[in-house]
Amino acid sequence: MTSPSAPLTGSIVALVTPMHDDGSVDYPALRKLIDWHIAEGTDCIGVVGTTGESPTVNVEEHCEIIRVSVEQAAKRVPIMAGCGANSTAEAIELARFAKKVGADSQLQVVPYYNKPTQEGQYRHFKAIAEAVGDLPMVLYNVPGRSVADMQHETVLRLTQVPGIVGIKEATGNIERAQWLIRDVPKGFAVYSGDDPTAVALMLCGGQGNISVTANVAPRLMHELCVAALAGDTRRAMEIQFRLMPVHKQLFVEANPIPVKWAVQRMGLCGGALRLPMTPLSQGNEAVVEAALRAAGLL
């Protein structure tokens, strides 16, 4: 489901990073997860993003996760490498590495904590694009986590920068997404970063969904995206209604706490997290399990 003018369309899993109980990255489990997603129909695998615990892996680990993912995917599906940082220099370093090892695109989040102005955001992303060259960049706007919010006008400025090909819009605000879809130039992709509103965004003209739920329901999310992108509202909403409890309960605590518990419960990989993330509370384990069962995933 690729396009010459954008990295991809369809279901992009925001993949968890498997870890051993001691907190070290479980690379064999990562390889198995990638194989499973390919078999289940995931259109693209996004690694080392928010769901992949990017804030708590060091640069060496970050690079190794990208390298292993690219190697294991072996061009069977594209790899979208999370390369975001609140230091422009570090983001460039990560993106250069991703390009060197063969990633298909990079995801660059709005710098968090240091709260750059709109001009600072523009210069940050422009500097990365100019430094890294032809590795397609997808912007990532998630003000609920980064605090800084990339405004509509800033996105439009960035659409004119060579190499910036899309945006993951994770506000869940469909009106805002519609304005973006209306105003961005042809060939610039708008992706949902919010599972509950992903169908609506795609039916409005968005190109896909960068999904947490796809960690536990990859085939269903792929089918949902196929239907929504084809304008088949009935089929898309049939799947969406089935997955709504999962969308909701995977955020009953901060992501990726619930989804890490869910993938362990499903036997896909271990559920260990790195501090300051802590395990899902016992009470919420039952809530997440009920959602998985309601969707037929257990």
From Swiss-Prot:
GO terms for cellular component: cytosol. It is an enzyme of class 4 (lyase). Pyruvate binds at T51, I210. It catalyses: L-aspartate 4-semialdehyde + pyruvate = (2S,4S)-4-hydroxy-2,3,4,5-tetrahydrodipicolinate + H2O + H(+). Homotetramer; dimer of dimers. The keyword Lyase applies. Its main location: cytoplasm. It comes from the Bacteria. This is 4-hydroxy-tetrahydrodipicolinate synthase. HAMAP family: DapA (MF_00418). GO terms for molecular function: 4-hydroxy-tetrahydrodipicolinate synthase activity. Pfam families: DHDPS. Catalyzes the condensation of (S)-aspartate-beta-semialdehyde [(S)-ASA] and pyruvate to 4-hydroxy-tetrahydrodipicolinate (HTPA). The record marks T50, Y113 as: Part of a proton relay during catalysis. GO terms for biological process: diaminopimelate biosynthetic process; lysine biosynthetic process via diaminopimelate. The keyword Amino-acid biosynthesis applies. Keywords: Amino-acid biosynthesis, Cytoplasm, Diaminopimelate biosynthesis, Lyase, Lysine biosynthesis, Schiff base. Gene3D superfamilies: Aldolase class I (3.20.20.70). Pathway: Amino-acid biosynthesis; L-lysine biosynthesis via DAP pathway; (S)-tetrahydrodipicolinate from L-aspartate: step 3/4. It is found in: Cytoplasm. Belongs to the DapA family.
